[in-house]
């Protein structure tokens, strides 16, 4: 059964056999992440946890003729954030949904154009893959607003780019351009805005050629703490060694080798 997004207002959902595209669509506020968007992401995650598929998250597409610049997400909705208090912070409104996205069974791709700032950047960090356009700007301006980057940047960012650069972004307000993000491997590919989604789908196609169960288990094991290895690797391999896909794919490989 396909996902029902008929009541959605912040996300536009497109679904195919092996993937879902979630396009954030609040251009009037630069795709600020508000409670409605968070709720819609939670509903989508519930579906993807039950029906594992690749997820591509993107924002408003650039349209030069209409004067529309590309926007991933400019951060949390400041109007809502201004009114949040201690109990809201302890509830982890944004951090909880970003962690849920990160834990989805199948890989998540962030296709980023324009601003990915604050919570928008933290959403991108939660993805397994990040590709972008030459117009991307990524950073953490939270301390300038009197708060901290508490939805993932304080721990994910140093794992992604190293502690010195992470501190520059978090404590000194550094904003990365596309070339810097690519050099730091924060993004792995750059595409022109008109080719960004084609690049995201090409990456999804490569993932889709792999065995889905092997991908799911490998993603899960990859995120395990160091002390869990190698025991968790061996248990995961034991599961895969009994899968029909393992026998079918290895036999197909051997058959191709015989023909050469």
Describe the function of each predicted region.
Residues 17-25, 36-84, 100-110, 129, ...:
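A structural preference for short, pocket-lining loop segments at secondary-structure junctions
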Residues 32-35, 74, 83, 171, ...:
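Phosphate-coordinating loops and pocket residues in cytosolic domains that bind phosphorylated ligands
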Residues 93-97, 153-156, 165, 217, ...:
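Hydrophobic alpha-helical segments typical of transmembrane helices
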